Amino acid sequence: MKKKLASVLLCTAMTAAVLAGCGGSSSETDTTAAQTSEEGSSAEGESTAAQTAEAQTAEAAANLTEFAEVPEDVDREQTLTYAQGADPRGLDPALVDDGESSKPIVQMYEGLTKFGDSNTEVEPCLAESWDISEDGLTYTFHLRQGVKFHDGTDFNAEAVKYNIDRQTVNKTSDMLYADFVFGDVAACNVVDEYTVEIVLSKPSTPFLNNLAMSLGAPMVSPTACEAAGNNLNEAPCGTGPYKFVRWDKNEAVVLERNEEYWGEKGVSKEIVFRTITDNSARVVALTNGEVDIIDGIDANVVDQITAAGCLLNKTEGMNINYLAYNTQKLTDPDVRRALSEAVNVPELVQSLYRGYASEATSILPSFMPGYSADVTQTQYDPEDAQAVLAEKGITEIHMLTYTNPRPYNTATGQTLAEAIQGYWDKVGVKCTIDAYDWTTYKEKIGTGDYDVCLYGWIGDNGDPDNFLNLLASEDIEMNVAQYHDEEFNQMLSDAASLPNGDERNAAYADMEQKVADENVWLPISHQENLAAYVGNVQNFIYHPTGNTFLSQTYKN
């Protein structure tokens, strides 16, 4: 007997869109939050300000968990402009791994499955339905008919096979998400024009979630991909509600509505993703009407945004902001432990994020399956840190970081690095910081030439496997700690095959404790997803994965 899957993992990512002011000038707007958090206030006071603003606006009309029906009289010739803090690395979902690329990608591409509007419940997309064999190894997908890629190529079973084979049997080293999405795929077989069979090497509980991910999983046009030499970074071609127009590097990506889209047509005629690297400049662009939506918001500019009468959208962050030790250079776990002991993480998080991030006591956010409050991290102990580091002869450390804001660290990597540098200086360790823009930083990571680096992760699918898998990756751009442990890898493989429930959750907690005991990472914080938009923007949802699906978002 075969069983039909109704849904799998539900990630309870609670959404709270905060209405801090509505439409109007700063003189007409309630600025209580700004007054509460005055210049020079303590970290505790700043945290209270954030909590006060949240409490005052908890019943905001902008709080959405699903997209509302779009009015018939809405202007469908409008342009929606979204500003983010870095340029995309590329627009081929198989060849990139960053959020700045993902945001335009999700407007243009789709996968076999998709997530709910504000959660990680799996829903049909390019596959209308699927069956799973009793042994959990064979997935039979029944595809949506009549769908075409933007270049007119038919979407069918052959197209699915092309995409999966591209990242399995024909995988190249720059396909960073291939193992995350298709690592357990043994074969992909065409049954008929609109039926495809995917065979796994072992049961995989997160497999359907993986197929809904914004990177790796989306279907690209085989025709366009072949014509572009297997690289669609600058010539994207999917099935989604928006099509590619142009990419002005370091300035903007421009998309237009796909008038032939199989589903509900996009509202805006055009969507523009602007790159504005400076946090303050991005806020100014919002408040003076140059852009409609911004993300990557530093807690220090929240008051400026609310005072201008803009809306602040806040969702619980499915992410982790961390310091990674290069275990191939810092091979002594006692040295790694001592360096972690020198950093006062609670104080650091409070001072940098002003209540818009929480201390990470775990790699996994507390609302995710697999999280356990029993997992213990290295605690602040500067006296022991200084003694151990002196005994080990550690006087210098080289740190690699990034200069721009990230969704998991809106304070910027450089600001965080300088704060950690200050803690290490107090225990007699001089830290040299090399900071680069995001693209250059990723290139530097690839060399492995660092003792420690700052990094982070945004959960792609609501499953703990997606976080812990980083520490088993052979790709240094994913596994920046260069942690390679056969026992851990086996634990990870076993856990992925377990059904959701207590046993599986305990398995991930055991993995977390193992890497915590070995001080592979120093978990720092879980950043709340912060976006802001002008008062006439409607139907905006900041998804827990950090993406923003904008086809039904509009200005009234």
Residue ranges of predicted features:
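Surface-exposed binding/hinge segments that line
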Residues: 177-224
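Gly/Pro-rich hinge or "lid" segments in bacterial periplasmic/extracellular proteins
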Residues: 116-117, 204, 212-266, 270
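Append "and occasionally in soluble cytosolic enzymes with long acidic Gly/Pro-rich linkers
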Residues: 254-257, 331-422, 510, 555
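Ligand-site clamp/hinge motif
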Residues: 258-303
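Detector for C-terminal structural segments
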Residues: 248, 342-370, 412-419, 442-556
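N-terminal lobe/hinge region of extracytoplasmic solute-binding protein
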Residues: 83-134, 165, 237
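Ligand/substrate-recognition segments at binding pockets and active sites
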Residues: 390-460
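Aromatic- and charge-enriched surface segment that lines or borders ligand/interaction sites
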Residues: 128-173, 197, 331
